[in-house]
Each structure stands twice: as structure tokens, then as C-alpha cells.
């Protein structure tokens, strides 16, 4: 068979003309042990080779040795040949091995495609969350174009349709705006005072519910408290507002210092003396005087020790006593 008519040689030459990568070392034969080329010995000291040393050695080998290609012919095929290139370079250290390409139609390709589908779904949910938070923080109607610019979306994005289906988001088709429906529609000091005046009970308004539609309400609450217009219950740890009430009693700082000191100097009796003090003043205490309660002492039963009866034997008188049991 001539060289021009050899199909294997023709495929090899065509493959060489297309491939312009680094030289590839042929795979080791079956049964041949793989040498550890990652370890070198210099002056009796053994250490791992660096990536630069290995790259330099590969360059020298490519200049000395030809490219070895292993061509495997597929069984039962007369027209196609499979060309396999096996890289024998060990890249365990430094993580310098190149990333492997995923073959189309393989299991890895299907897993990658499924993963990309999940990422696209999660990306839509993330954009929906960002849009909701943006509308909530604004505290006022937001234009659709403003929301699209903020999220870098197009007008036909499906996130817009998902926003219209949310219960806490109101869409105005005439104005083209989105509005967050908070627990209390309060966004100014006057609206807060109006809400507190309209309360029938003294339960108070939760600041957590106020921040649902008005995240920046802390500054307004502090200012209204300074003006003695509202009453605020704060946490003990960081003094953040918890509940607010409308102050219908006037200025909170109008009490003279003299009365404040008088109130602080009043000493309350001890808990045990409180019922007797009330009786001396002609008042009936709601609780029983602890001094009138007789203490009931529990009688402790002492168990008597039983005396154990020991065995009485006459073994020391066996020679003196006589046995008359046969006469009975």
C-alpha cells in the first residue's frame, strides 16, 4: 500500500495540520510502571519539582522527541477513525492541570445543563426579591421604568408579571407604578400622630409594623418623643423603640425637680411589714400577714432498729447433755 493511499496516514497528517498545541507524550504500555517525574534529588535532598521546572523540561523534551500519537481504529467502521491523545503529565501539585472540556451528550453535559437551568430560575427569584425590597424601601409608588433601570431588566421581563401577582404589591396601570402595601400606611409624622389618636385601646403600635412600610421611622419617633407628643417603650439592651402611644397628658418634662426628689425619697416598708402598716392606717391588706401564719413543723419519724436474733447452739455441751427425742 502506497503512502498516498494510506487512510490512516492521511488522517494523521490532517490532524497534525489542525492541532497547534503543546506536544503530547504517548501513554505508557500495559504493565509498565509510571515514573514519578514530580520528585527530583539534588545533592542528596529530595523535593518536589516546581511548575516552572516542569514546564522547562517539557519544552526540552518537545525539541528532542517527536510527537507520538496513538490512533485507534473503531471496530466495524470502514470510514471513520478515532484519534486519542493521552497526556501523561502528572499535575497533582500546584493545581496546574487544565480544565477538561465536557463532551456533548455525556452525563456531565446533562448535569451542567440542569445546573444552568436551576441558576436561571434562582436568578429570576433573586430579581423578584430585589424588586420587592426596593419598592418597600422607597415607601412610595415606584415607576416601572425606574425599577427596570435599577435591576437592568427589559420591559418584557417576566419578573414584572410576577410582581403584579404578589399580594403585598399594588400595581397602578394608569400611572404605571408599583406600591408596597404595608401593615400601616404611614410615612410622615402627621400620619403617625393621626394613627395613634385613632387607637381605641391602649395596646400601642408596634414599631416593627411601622418599619414594614416606613423603614426610616426611628428618627421621626425620637423627634416626636423629644417634643412630648408620643410615649415610647424601648428595649433595655440597645434602646431601640418597640411600641409607641399618643401622649394625651401634656409635657413630660413639666414636673418640678422638688417633687421628683420627694417621690424618690419616699421609702416603702418591707414586704413582711406591709400588711401591718396597712392595718395601722385602717386599710385592709389584700394579702395575709406573714407574721400571723403559724409554721407547721413536720414530725420526723425515727425508725427503731430491730435487734437481730442470733442462733443459739449448744455445741460446747455435746458431751454433757443427753438426747431424749426418741421418747417423744
UniProtKB/Swiss-Prot annotation:
Stretch list, region Disordered: 32-105
Biological process according to GO: transcription by RNA polymerase II; transcription initiation at RNA polymerase II promoter
GO cellular component: nucleus; transcription factor TFIIE complex; transcription preinitiation complex
Biased composition (Acidic residues): 85-94
Portion annotated as DNA-binding: 113-187
GO molecular function, one term: DNA binding
Job description of the protein: Recruits TFIIH to the initiation complex and stimulates the RNA polymerase II C-terminal domain kinase and DNA-dependent ATPase activities of TFIIH. Both TFIIH and TFIIE are required for promoter clearance by RNA polymerase.
Subunit comment: TFIIE is a tetramer of two alpha (TFA1) and two beta (TFA2) subunits.
Protein name: Transcription initiation factor IIE subunit beta
Gene (UniProt): TFA2
Amino acid at each position: 500500500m502506497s503512502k498516498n493511499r494510506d487512510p490512516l496516514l492521511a488522517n494523521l497528517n490532517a490532524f497534525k495540520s489542525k492541532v497547534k498545541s503543546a506536544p503530547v507524550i504517548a501513554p505508557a504500555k500495559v504493565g509498565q510502571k509510571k515514573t514519578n517525574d514530580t520528585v527530583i534529588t539534588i545533592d542528596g535532598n529530595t523535593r518536589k519539582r516546581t511548575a516552572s521546572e516542569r514546564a522547562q523540561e517539557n519544552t526540552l523534551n518537545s525539541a528532542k522527541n517527536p510527537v507520538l500519537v496513538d490512533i485507534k481504529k473503531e471496530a466495524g467502521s470502514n470510514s471513520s477513525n478515532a484519534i486519542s491523545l493521552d497526556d501523561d503529565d502528572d499535575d497533582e501539585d500546584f493545581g496546574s492541570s487544565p480544565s477538561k472540556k465536557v463532551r456533548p451528550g455525556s452525563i456531565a453535559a446533562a448535569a451542567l445543563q440542569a445546573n444552568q437551568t436551576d441558576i436561571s430560575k434562582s436568578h429570576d427569584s433573586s430579581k423578584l426579591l430585589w424588586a420587592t425590597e426596593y419598592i418597600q424601601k422607597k415607601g412610595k409608588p415606584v415607576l416601572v421604568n425606574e425599577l427596570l433601570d435599577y435591576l437592568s431588566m427589559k420591559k418584557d421581563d417576566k419578573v414584572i408579571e410576577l410582581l403584579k401577582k404578589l399580594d403585598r404589591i399594588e400595581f397602578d396601570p394608569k400611572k404605571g407604578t408599583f406600591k408596597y402595601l404595608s401593615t400601616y400606611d404611614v410615612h410622615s409624622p402627621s400620619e403617625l400622630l393621626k394613627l395613634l389618636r385613632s387607637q381605641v385601646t391602649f395596646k400601642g403600635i408596634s414599631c416593627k409594623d411601622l418599619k414594614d412600610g416606613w423603614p426610616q421611622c426611628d428618627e421621626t419617633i425620637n423627634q416626636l418623643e423629644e417634643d412630648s407628643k408620643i410615649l415610647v417603650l424601648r428595649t433595655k439592651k440597645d434602646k431601640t423603640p418597640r411600641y409607641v402611644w399618643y401622649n394625651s397628658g401634656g409635657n413630660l418634662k413639666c414636673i418640678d425637680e422638688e417633687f421628683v426628689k420627694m417621690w424618690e425619697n419616699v421609702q416603702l416598708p418591707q414586704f413582711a411589714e406591709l400588711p401591718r402598716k396597712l392595718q395601722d392606717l385602717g386599710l385592709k391588706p389584700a394579702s395575709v400577714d406573714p407574721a400571723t401564719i403559724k409554721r407547721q413543723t413536720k414530725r420526723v419519724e425515727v425508725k427503731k432498729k430491730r435487734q437481730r436474733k442470733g442462733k443459739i447452739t449448744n455445741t460446747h455441751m455435746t458431751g454433757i447433755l443427753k438426747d431424749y427425742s426418741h421418747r417423744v
